[in-house]
């Protein structure tokens, strides 16, 4: 077991939801 219990667990990978327009329109140009 090489788990580092001394260190806090990594935060869950939960990216912010995309903007509403993303669902019906292409992303804005960069």
Curated annotation (Swiss-Prot):
One of its GO terms (cellular component) is extracellular region. It is found in: Secreted, Cell wall. O-glycosylated. The keyword Secreted applies. The keyword Methyltransferase does not apply. Keywords: Cell wall, Glycoprotein, Hydroxylation, Secreted. It comes from the Eukaryota. The modification 4-hydroxyproline is found at residues 8-12, 17-20, 26-29. Its main location: secreted. This is 136 kDa hydroxyproline-rich cell wall glycoprotein, major component.
């Amino acid at each position: 077991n090489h788990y580092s219990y001394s260190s806090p667990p990594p935060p869950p990978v939960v990216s912010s939801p995309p903007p509403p327009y993303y669902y019906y329109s292409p992303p804005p140009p960069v």
